[in-house]
Structure formats: C-alpha cells, structure tokens
From Swiss-Prot:
Gene: CIB1
Binding site for Ca(2+) 2: 161, 163, 165, 167, 172
Result of changing residue 167 to A: No effect on phosphorylation by PKD/PRKD2; in isoform 2
Tissue: Ubiquitously expressed. Expressed in the epidermis, hair follicles and keratinocytes. Detected in platelets and in cell lines of megakaryocytic and erythrocytic lineages. Both isoform 1 and isoform 2 are detected in various cancer cell lines, with isoform 2 being the predominant form (at protein level).
Mutagenesis or variant effect for residue 173 to A: Loss of binding to ITGA2B. Does not inhibit interaction with PAK1
Function: Calcium-binding protein that plays a role in the regulation of numerous cellular processes, such as cell differentiation, cell division, cell proliferation, cell migration, thrombosis, angiogenesis, cardiac hypertrophy and apoptosis. Involved in bone marrow megakaryocyte differentiation by negatively regulating thrombopoietin-mediated signaling pathway. Participates in the endomitotic cell cycle of megakaryocyte, a form of mitosis in which both karyokinesis and cytokinesis are interrupted.
Name of the molecule in the record: Calcium and integrin-binding protein 1
The organism of origin for this protein: Homo sapiens (Human)
EF-hand domain sequence ranges: 103-138, 148-183
C-alpha cells in the first residue's frame, strides 16, 4: 500500500481494536482488502474511511461469495441510508462479529438479525421458510415441497418457540443456539 499516507494511524488502530474483536493485524488486513475494492483515487486512508463500497463488490470477495446469506449479511451491517453499500467501519463490524474472538452472544444476536428477513424482531414462518431455502437452495432437486417445509417449520417451532406465540424471539433463538456447540465456530469469516 505504499507511502506514509496509506496506513491507519496508531490512534485509529487502537480505537478500532477497542471497538471490535479484531487484532491490529486483522484490522490492517481488512483495510487493505477494503481498499482493493475501491477505485485507485479513493485508496488513501482519508478517502477510504469516507468511501462506500457497493454490495456487488463486497459480494465478490471469496470469503462471502459462497455464503447463502451474503445479501442479508451486507444489509444487516450496512449503515448507508439505501442499505446498498458498506463503509470501512461497516466492513470492520462485519468482520468483527464473524471473527473467532467474538462472543457467542454477539454472534447469536447478529445471526438472529440476519435470519430475520422482514426485520420485525422475530423469526416467523416466512423467515424460517426463507432461511431453509437459503440453506437448501432453490433448485428443483433441492427445494422442499410445501408439506415438507410445513413439517420442518412446525418441528423448528415445536423445539424453539418456548412461549408458543408462533414465532421465535431473540432469547428463544439464543437458547437454541446455546445448545449448538458448533455454532460459534461455523459462524465466521476469515480474510
């Protein structure tokens, strides 16, 4: 990345370390990868910290390309008014939550937000159906039939919907996730 103007200041690095679960090296790597997505004229530290990278470019990163929830991940972490791009700080937040050192509570909170497709604060039947379709694919050979989908969602709600209101709230989701030892290790993105 070259000259003295192309590195994050020690103060900014320290601030990002305090606010994320990332190490200094991970933050520097994240900044380098973010800058690679920018036009040449926006790659200075000052410009890169103000820049917004469109989702199409973020989604081209190999670390996200194969993730079935990639669009939702970008939407959840985007602070842009149109929810169609990520700033460097949005990108850092994303990487922080998906890092090995993020707490299980943080990971489950963001997983819940990613799976809450309609952003209403609960996982309802439609959210669960979309979740299953993301995981199984929407091809003819992998898509569940309507009856299979209904049975699966009924089973999920039977196991997870503690208050029996027909939806899964955050605490119910976190309760289920707490019984899944592989969740934290599988909910990660490494640059």
């Amino acid at each position: 990345m070259g000259g003295s103007g192309s590195r994050l200041s020690k103060e900014l690095l320290a601030e990002y370390q305090d606010l994320t679960f990332l190490t200094k090296q991970e933050i520097l790597l994240a900044h380098r990868r973010f800058c690679e997505l920018l036009p040449q004229e926006q790659r200075s530290v000052e410009s890169s910290l103000r820049a917004q990278v469109p989702f199409e470019q973020i989604l081209s990163l190999p670390e996200l390309k194969a993730n079935p929830f990639k669009e939702r991940i970008c939407r959840v972490f985007s602070t842009s008014p149109a929810k169609d791009s990520l700033s460097f700080e949005d990108f850092l937040d994303l990487l922080s939550v998906f890092s090995d050192t993020a707490t299980p509570d943080i990971k489950s909170h963001y997983a819940f937000r990613i799976f809450d497709f309609d952003d209403d604060g609960t996982l309802n039947r439609e959210d669960l159906s979309r979740l299953v379709n993301c995981l199984t694919g929407e091809g003819e050979d992998t898509r569940l039939s309507a009856s299979e989908m209904k049975q699966l969602i009924d089973n999920i709600l039977e196991e997870s919907d503690i208050d029996r209101d027909g939806t899964i709230n955050l605490s119910e989701f976190q309760h289920v996730i707490s019984r899944s030892p592989d969740f934290a290790s599988s909910f990660k993105i490494v640059l």
